[in-house]
Design a protein with these regions (language model features):
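Function-dense linear segments that define catalytic or interfacial modules
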Residues: 82-167
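C-terminal polymerase-core module
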Residues: 1-47, 214-262, 266-268, 308, ...
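Catalytic palm subdomain of template-directed nucleic-acid polymerases
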Residues: 192-203, 305-320
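Short Gly/Ser/Thr- and Asp/Glu-enriched loop/turn motifs at secondary-structure junctions
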Residues: 4-8, 176, 298-302
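Conserved catalytic core of nucleic-acid polymerases
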Residues: 63, 77-78, 82-85, 160-293, ...
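Conserved "right-hand" nucleotidyltransferase catalytic core of DNA-directed polymerases
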Residues: 1-105, 121, 128-131, 191, ...
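Catalytic palm active-site di-aspartate
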Residues: 127, 191, 208, 296-310, ...
Length: 349
């Protein structure tokens, strides 16, 4: 069986093995990743199919794709666009170096392909939970601000509040659920989606959300206020007053209007984070130039900056990059950047 072939996969799984059919499309039973994940407990062959598809994707898109992108100087040169995304994030294309996998260990291995030139190393620094820090600041939520500024683990702290127990009794599963709620709130997640993400009932998911919003009451008020403000002004804006106009808020179609409300909630958060990293890039570049260091900013991946520098200057460069990132702007919440040094991108990150 060719695991990439949809037809052959259907025949093998649903006819030959007699596995339950979870989802049907116009062309037949679906064998997409979501369906296969739901069938993992039915037969061990599912794991093999998923792994094969993952390896095939990594091989074709990243291994072979990146090899084709290497230019005559032995380097890969991408193009950056400042105005491609509506949130204000910088995007990368031809090739897109911002979508190198990071969620899985196998995917992260792809970063080993990217190495510094002889005698140099890579300095990599990224913001820690910048969108949640921005949310805490915009919402002026005292509990969340205090948690961040005290150096607490925000997901453990949230879990302790949501599950009403001391932090030392918070389990990994509780922290994982709290993490999903923390990040989900930024994107306007509902009980249905949260329940699906963390594997609980819709009722439990709603209880988590309600408990979260009771704990962080400032966030709750902010989420309502920011939509009302956007509806009144006709646009949503970042901390630095960059606007995104939202005609969707006046739509008669309920789904379009709901989408506009989600944008009104998360644009100030995502947009402010995007503004901050751009400010940090300017400050880092200027500082490296002012101090006449043999160092060059070579890549930005959303909340992450990568600098190529001489090994001799690497510790100084790491100090500069993290310092400028953390002081990119003044907020009620301290910004935090974590960094490392390595010969390749995998090691540096």
């Amino acid at each position: 069986m060719n695991s990439i072939s949809i037809h052959q996969s259907r025949v093998a799984l649903f006819e030959d093995l007699g596995l339950p059919c979870k989802k049907k499309t116009k062309s037949g039973y679906s064998t997409n990743a979501e369906v296969l994940e739901g069938l993992r407990s039915e037969n061990p062959v599912i794991d093999c199919i998923l792994e094969y598809r993952t390896l095939t994707k990594l091989k074709s898109t990243y291994c072979e794709g990146l090899l084709k992108a290497i230019q005559s100087d032995g380097r890969i040169h991408t193009s950056f666009n400042q105005v491609e995304t509506r949130t204000g994030r910088i995007s990368s294309l031809e090739p897109n170096l911002q979508n190198i996998p990071i969620r899985t260990e196998l995917g992260r291995e792809m970063r080993k392909f990217f190495i510094a030139k002889d005698g140099d190393v890579l300095v990599d620094a990224d913001y820690s939970q910048i969108e949640l820090r921005v949310l805490a600041d915009l919402a002026n939520d005292e509990n969340m601000i205090n948690a961040f500024n005290s150096g607490a683990d925000i997901h453990t702290s949230t879990a302790a509040q949501v599950f009403n127990m001391p932090e030392e009794f918070v389990t990994k599963q509780m922290r994982s659920s709290a993490k999903a709620v923390n990040f989900g709130i930024v994107y306007g997640i509902g009980a249905f989606s949260l329940a699906k993400d963390i594997g609980v009932s819709r009722k439990e998911a709603q209880e988590y959300i309600d408990s979260y919003l009771a704990t962080y009451s400032g966030v709750n008020k902010y989420m309502t206020h920011v939509i009302d403000l956007a509806r009144e002004k006709g646009y949503s804006e970042t901390l630095f007053k960059r606007r995104r106009y939202l005609p969707e808020l006046n739509a008669t179609n309920h789904m379009v209007k709901a989408a506009g409300e989600r944008i009104a909630r998360n644009m100030p958060i995502q947009g402010t984070a995007a503004d901050i990293i751009k400010i940090a890039m300017i400050k880092v570049d200027k500082r490296l130039d002012d101090e006449k260091l043999d160092a060059h900013l070579i890549l930005q991946v959303h909340d992450e900056l990568i600098v190529e520098t001489s090994e001799a200057d690497s510790k100084k460069v790491l100090e500069i990059v993290t310092e400028e990132m953390e002081n990119a702007c003044q907020m009620k919440v301290k910004l935090r950047a974590d960094g490392a040094i390595g010969k390749d991108w995998y090691t540096a990150h």
